[in-house]
Amino acid sequence: MSIQQRSVPLWFSSLNRCILRKVKLSFFFLTLLFLVGCSSSKFIPENEYLLQEVEIKSDQKGFDAASLEPYIRQKANSKWFSLFNIPLGTYSLSGRDTTKWVNRTLRKIGEEPVLFDTVQANQSMNDLKKALQNAGYMHADVDLQTKIKGKKLKAIYTLHLGEPYRINRVRYDIADERIKRILALDKPQHAIRSLQSGSRFTVERLDEERNRITKLLLDSGFYKFHKDFIVFEADSARNNTDINLVVRLLKYRAYSDAPETNHPRYFIRDVKFSSSEESGIHLRPKILEYNTAIKAGEPFSAAHLQATYNNFARLQAVRYTNIKFKELPDTTLLDCDIQLSHNKPHTLSFQPEGTNTAGDLGAAVSLTYENRNLFRGSEVLRVQLRGAFEAITGLEGYNDQDYQEYNAEAKLQFPRLLAPFLSSAFQRRSTASSELSFSYNLQNRPEFHRRVLSAAFRYRWNEPKRYSSYRMDLIDLNYVYMPWISDTFKRDYLDDVSSRNAILRYNYENLLVMKMGFGLRFNNGRHAMIANIETAGNILKGFSKVLSFRKNAQGQYTLFNTAYAQYVKGDFDYTRLITFDTHNSLALHIDLGLAYPYGNSKILPFEKRYFSGGANSVRGWSVRELGPGSFRGTDGRIDFINQTGDMKLDMSIEYRTKLFWKFHGAAFVDAGNIWTLRQYEEQPGGQFKLHEFYKQIAVAYGLGLRLNFDFFILRFDMGMKAINPAYETQREHFAVLHPNFGRDFTFHFAVGMPF
């Protein structure tokens, strides 16, 4: 008996796959709903209720009631993405027997039910009332309403504000004429004070004015002044919300029974340096003076004291600083003793590492020497030698199959601004450092040999009060020399006359890049910004015309028979973090970049070109897989040369939620692409055009997992293509409407901060 095997129709196989996907998706959502709906009533005692939700509202429109949420002592159980009560559902899956490992694990991962507590609710009402009174609402009241449904309770706190108290008139009662002059009460700049007529009468404003006066006096020689010497007297008429305020400075007493006197003003008599080590002080006297803001003969200043601490903290030769003041008996003079403890001047480190490049195994080793006090001025010299070796497989037609790289780098950092055209007073106030660096890199590959010589001089400085840091590259010089290229590599990649090979060939020619640049970073926890701009070749172009430099066959000016690059490039990166609660936040991100070659260059150097896709870009695509524009690589393969551009746009919105322990989840939508500024034959659809670029913006969506170890984050992202500009058919262009896991899914792993 023979058995005939029937073929299965293609439409039937596709239908089965579609049904299977829907079954898997349905199973996932059913599991999610099961965890969300898991009953926690077995952990809720009789006559008690689960605190399901807390709401805070005001009886006055425009008042930000949500800002007072920190005063609510009980919060409901956290929810994933502010929607799914998974932590409570996980805890509810556990049994009562805590000796079992599975129950302990479920309870550790989940969250114990929050039971409504009337005692904590009453304390919350009192705290809210005090907070409102401190904000000027002296007659404020708070009531609590509870809504019960089954074993669940919703708590609603309503704020009844009343009329706020406002400052009608401010009078300063200060007898000491010296302090009056310092506070400049009779001058226009006094308007910067926190207490102004018509402003709301708040504890915060009183504290601001107290701190302002205290800072001014501490910076003006009043060494023993503190905030407790400032008292406020407020007076208001009955049934009136206007406050007449008196700011009074109490007199000074040397001790409790001493008579009252004017506050003494102290001056610095002498400044000395000492060291806790037997070897003494390792810094030159000029460096000590340069970093000391405290000067003999000047009034004591808390600002100068802090500046001196900050200056010595920047010196890597110094481990810690301790500054002491000693009063001279029966005088208002101070002796200052600055005690320094030094770091070890020399360090030597050795680091081996293994490498794996696309399956090719290799090894590398680096040796680093650091001197933290080279010229006894806390100059830091860092010298690093590195060697790497890798066995390359899969190359045909080449005599050698090994990759070798050797690198030597030297950096010399000065903890001050090296600028002879600036005054010494300005340099002393500056927190900038200067850095001089040199490096030489040697690469020997089967395809080519490359040598790169680099030199740079730059400034760096910080402004902690503004959460900002800056970098200025006065000169950054790179010389790329190609001593040898194999005939096989030339024949296969460089000899073709197409534009693709023009881009590739440009990166395997001798090249000189001399650039200048400026960059800034800002981050205050809610807003983060990175901006950079650089220009290259302009100075050389000026010399080329004046000194009549030679031109090569392509019409480019050359220096030592090497063409130099000329371009301008700017980048802007901005992130906004919106925090909803301790477990949920929203991150908005945009990244813009534009680079334009001109003058002596028709093409950007390859390392200055933009690419799209990857863990820090549009996460539905792999690195360098997207763009430019609607361009698609040959046969859908990644083209590392052609899939680059002169401008980029990346946008992202990411909702982040804490899961358990150090695990965090994320749901994201990304959008962006890259474009070229010129039309290239080998990059059809890649040029930026104002009337159609928005049609070429790629969109992706997905989920991510974060493992937060405080110092670094492990990121796992699963992205799916939603809109693919490389295709015109509706099925492939709008991939979100016709998802195909094999075609659209991309996995990313990265280490670092999200962005």
Q: Language-model features: where?
A:
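Flexible glycine-/small-residue-rich
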Residues: 58-60, 159-163, 174-176, 247-251, ...
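C-terminal beta-signal and adjacent terminal beta-strands/loops
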Residues: 671-688, 711, 719-737, 753-755
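Gram-negative/organellar outer-membrane beta-barrel architecture
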Residues: 181-182, 301-528, 619-620, 626, ...
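Residues on the lipid-exposed face of transmembrane beta-strands in outer-membrane beta-barrel proteins
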Residues: 365-371, 408-414, 438, 455-459, ...
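C-terminal outer-membrane beta-barrel translocator/porin domains of Gram-negative envelope proteins
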Residues: 355-358, 471-657, 667-691
